[in-house]
Amino acid sequence: MRRVLFGTVFAILGMADARADKCPPLTVPVPEKFEQTSRNDVKVPDIVDYGDKSMDAFFEKLARVARGQHVLLRIGTYGDSNWTNDRTAGEIRRRLQLAFGDGGHGFVGFGIPWGWYHHQNVQHGVTGKWNAWNLSAMPIKDGMYSFAGMSAESSQPGATAWVETAKPGAPVGTSVASFEMSYLARPKGGTFEVLLDGEVKDTIDSSATAAEVKYLKYKVADGAHKLVIKVKQGSVRLFGVALERDKGIVLDGIGVNALNPLRMTQMDRAQLAAGLTRRSYDLLIETTGTNVWSPIDHKTVMPELMQLFKQALPSAAFMLWSAPDFVKMNREGQEPISEPAMRFMASSKKQMAETFKIGWWDQFAALGGGGSAPKWTKSRFYEADGIHIGPRMNAYIGERFVHALLKELAKRVDKDPKLGCAK
């Protein structure tokens, strides 16, 4: 109930009748209290723009969405195994969509690359036999993963991969206005059918003279829908599908096991750039750090990755997050301690945000910094390994980041009451 009221309050305060005032006051509802609390709570760090104005366009557009304008704002997130279950991204997505409008689920990969790969507030799955590839744990020789670092392939006639809007009653995700799916065209590629709500819309021959990521977009009446890809013959490789509506917030939660900047720069750079350009993010967030073991290499690789991002998305805002603390592997019977390197990694990544003149949010500090992981593990916010975060921590992080985002928007609206109005 609290979440429903959160969105309703925003609608009343922010989306006033434009006929009465071409630029009515915009009140940003920054919650006074957190729903997710713990004895380990600390002050939530603010979002910092080290470029001074690098995030201006993003917050301007966010204010336009808040004012009820017919605008779709896209956010992309890259994370490691802690993001593969979509729980942190899902919490952020859900809270932002309840506040600003549901713009669609965003990207979800076809197939099940990990047993726990289940996105929030959307339904998806496969039937029949599929091979799932990803750039870190299950690589494929040709390196064709598209921009999300994952793919699924089947040569079994009748095998399906599908995605569907959330079940009725879900807080968000129950409607979609378009599906844009991606697949691999290549020599000796197979054929597949595209079904919308049980009706065959297309039969696609994926054979081509050279390997290439291709896209198919299907517009539908805004509402509940199901997209199914059905293998007819030959080998078919799929990447993913983006579910969108005409306005509101859409958030792509991309998580790959053991992801780090080095692995991302080892992807086919043309595929990565093309995919990012097509998704056209207004804000791209990079959250990795748990799987970075060479700070020196990190400092040489991260600039390469940021250059790729900026070339693919010249108008976007960018933000780095520090990674959370985690428990160092100890001998059996010893008291768990934090991995000392994570304190350095947080500091190093902050320096990179300063160097690149982009946005920064200190997740490491938001969870209590060095020494916090053993406490969170003991209180069961982390999984038993002390490395992977659990559902309560996913919700905890997501709520605090959204709080920081709303707080930053509120500060900007206080400074410029006409933020988001037509100039």
Language-model features: where?
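Cleaved targeting-peptide boundary
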Residues: 19-26
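Conserved SGNH/GDSL esterase-like catalytic core that processes O-acyl groups on lipids
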Residues: 74, 82-304
